[in-house]
């Protein structure tokens, strides 16, 4: 895939994540399009020109762009992502139980990514019908193997026991 769609204009921190990732992908030679949730209809026109089937993916956080927003979803027609067969990679920052209703109607090529091992286990158990693309540690998070020798403290379930601090 040579083209990446990211979303901005929604939750400020999620837009920040998207912009930072987009900057790096641009540096790596990918074409990046920012769909602006504050200007959905104008962004939708530009989005349709940007998408090249077979070359474009959506990378989003917490279902932004997958909530039937104007510009990416039309009643009776569905998502633009399905129309152009765009794979949708959703990095779920919050616990999956917040998203039960959103999981009811998603694009055909929806892929779920968890940032927490417990969220990942919950998602696999209660939503086996979706393709899970695994665990993505938060940037700046240390891997368990690196954390133990440096701190001498136990890391359990991706969390440091507060009594050990």
Question: Which residues does each PLM region occupy?
Answer:
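Nucleotide-sugar donor-binding catalytic core of glycosyltransferases
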Residues: 8-11, 17, 129-165
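Extended catalytic core of nucleotide-activated donor transferases of GT-like folds
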Residues: 14-126, 144-145
